[in-house]
Amino acid sequence: MTNGHIRVSRRWVVACLLAGAADRAFGLPLSHSPRPELRPAGPVASGADALIEAARLGGKIGFVVADARTGAVLEARNPILRLPPASTAKAVTTLYALAKLPPDYRFQTRVLATGPVRGGRVEGDLVLAGTGDPVLDTDTLAGLAAGLKAAGVREVAGKFRYFAGALPHLKVIDPEQPDHVSYNPAVSGLNLNFNRVLFEWHRASAGWDVTMDARSNSYRPRVGMSRMRVVNRQSPIYTYDDRAGTDDWTVASAVLGNGGSRWLPVRKPALYAAEVFQTLARSHGIVLPAPVAAPALPQGAVIVAHDSPVLRELLTDMLKYSTNMTAEVIGMTATYAGGGHPVSLSGSAAAMNDWLGETLGIRRARFVDHSGLGSGSRIAAADMVKLLVAAGADGPLRPLMKPVWLRDAKGRPVKDHPVRIRAKTGTLNFASALTGYVTTADGRELAFATFMADEERRAKLDRASRERPKGGRSWATRARTLQLKLIERWATLYGA
């Protein structure tokens, strides 16, 4: 071992692991070179070491770059050191979902009537039933309400129920995150607007005018299940309480200024969706009673329904925008499709861990969720590259990944650069990851994974400081710069 880089013997072992795994995982034909082409260890290692030293990250760094078609390892540093994957976990979730669900899978949201419709009146209950659609939004609910009117419904004799039991209701993705961060919402079988509500405030003659609404491009329905009170204090900025069936928030007056807005997480997404649907139905002249939860899916006739985009489109957007809720919904749905019945994210992630072991022989990785938000997830660069090689340079994952561009001396993306990258980024506090595929200027395909984390600094953060820790932004910028410089170097050194 020299400066964390692998000498010939261990590089060969890792190369064999990467190449051999591909056959077992997805049945993809790969051509194996009998031995990876080895280059002089000294200059190669020193080049990467200089970049790492210049980044001044501290902590631990692990990376592997390999030929994406043969699995031959070209360079590695701490390849079997397990580090936080952050949102690169979504690449694993993507392949897990594609293995368990058809690529044209859709989530369906339905409006059911448990009795006949006579003279515009539902002689029974009306039911809003979800299957977990992670991209259901207010505009879509408005379309369902319009469809209800078009079907001739004007009133309901029974109750207005909502069903969200297709997936378990989980109030948060990661309990270690601050209460108010919108990237850590609830997850359920009936979701809306990525389970976020818009808090908006304006200065008034006596304090502030405050609204909480389910805003979309076309609508601003206010909600009552999430409430905000302005409190005369300096800190904490936000507090949250689950009170009498509502999300009860307070905000410190000292931070509000003259006005602004912010998305906050919703902890009762099914009730949120039902309340918004009730409001939108009223705009079409349909008066619904207060929504109540249905413990089981009622039997009834479908009046109107909405299908989500197909799975591949959902995965593409999930990888592009790194939406945590989408990852958790799709991951749990995949586990259910595989015969599992998890009641927690960790339980569903355990099923994904088992799948990694059974299909790829990856048994050291540990995921605690499907998004990478949880701090307990760990994977080694060698195992992530093994997954990428198994998926294939021409396989299902690469076209779903977003393009990443190398940068010029001023940090601007060079979109016409001959080196092309498709990858997934990942960022947590003092942890950064980038993993994906590179096409070099002369056409060679590489698979890579880079993981960087300062675990000591991460461990010192308290819950309140995790949204914007001191020094976190500059650390993340240096980490991302290092990752791109490593890729640029690999593309130059290991071109065909």
Predicted regions and their residues:
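Short active-site loop at a secondary-structure junction
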Residues: 59, 76-96
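N-terminal export signals
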Residues: 2-7, 11-29
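A short, well-structured edge-of-sheet supersecondary motif
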Residues: 53-77
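Structural recognition of the beta-strand scaffold that forms the well-ordered cores
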Residues: 64, 127, 326-329, 366, ...
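Conserved serine DD-peptidase/penicillin-binding transpeptidase domain
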Residues: 28-53, 100-363, 442, 460-466, ...
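A short glycine/serine-rich beta->alpha loop
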Residues: 77-83, 263, 371-374
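Small-residue-rich helix-loop
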Residues: 335-496
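Residue-level preference for non-acidic, small/hydrophobic
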Residues: 71, 90-97, 160, 190, ...
